[in-house]
């Protein structure tokens, strides 16, 4: 299990396998223009102190943005 600094234990990737982790890493390197704009607003806890992760693997999917604290997924199309 992975941990975020100071938070309780939780399964950060919720069962995502190694291949999906590699796919997510590749997607982080090739974000769309819309994803880049939103990421500039979400990164470094700029949104009320919430921490977001980009191109985050969950189960069998890679979500554009994920905030565990708020249990929030954001998809940009």
Regions found by a protein language model. Give the residues of each.
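Solvent-exposed, charged helical/coil patches
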Residues: 1-53
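Active-site metal-binding core of divalent-cation-utilizing nuclease and nuclease-like domains
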Residues: 43-73
């Amino acid at each position: 299990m992975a941990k975020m600094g100071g938070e309780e234990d939780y399964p950060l990737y919720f069962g995502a396998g190694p291949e999906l982790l590699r796919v997510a890493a590749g997607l982080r390197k090739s974000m769309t223009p819309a994803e880049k704009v939103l990421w500039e607003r979400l990164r470094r806890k700029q949104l009320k102190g919430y921490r977001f992760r980009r191109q985050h693997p969950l189960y069998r999917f890679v979500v554009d943005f994920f905030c565990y604290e708020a249990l929030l997924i954001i998809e940009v199309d």
